[in-house]
Amino acid sequence: MSDFLIGIDLGTSNSAVAYIDRSKGPDALVLDFPIVQPIRPSDVRPQPLLPSALYLQHPNELPVEAYALPWDPAPKQIVGEFARWQGAKVPSRLVTSAKSWLSHGGVDRTAPILPWGAPPDVEKMSPVEASSRLLLHIRNAWNRPNKRAIRAG
């Protein structure tokens, strides 16, 4: 059994993580978990919220070092704050509000439809895939070996 109880709020705009360290017993407190993410080119650090955004960069658009993560030196897409920032410049490559599409009755949530209205040269993903990638990012941030230093900070 894990020493931690973890709660994830996969939000339409932002996602958050809170946890309890069960090894602390009945005095355990609910604590926020800052989520490591790229903020700007080559600036990766923990933030209290993860914008629920993915940016599907063009292969030659940015050097991979600009959005590399401690657990993945060459991510397939940009996640979080940097995704939202870069997507403001190139909105046709930005996936946001993926969670809203999961319950939309007029679309196949497993079909590659996002970014909605993107030109044909932009590789699309499904709302399920986008939500899954956000959750995977959160899982990887939680599982990184030196996360305790961030939480203690």
Predicted regions and their residues:
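Gly/Thr-rich phosphate-binding beta-strand-loop-beta motif of the actin/hexokinase/Hsp70
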Residues: 2-28
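Phosphate-binding loop and its immediate beta->loop->alpha context
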Residues: 31-153
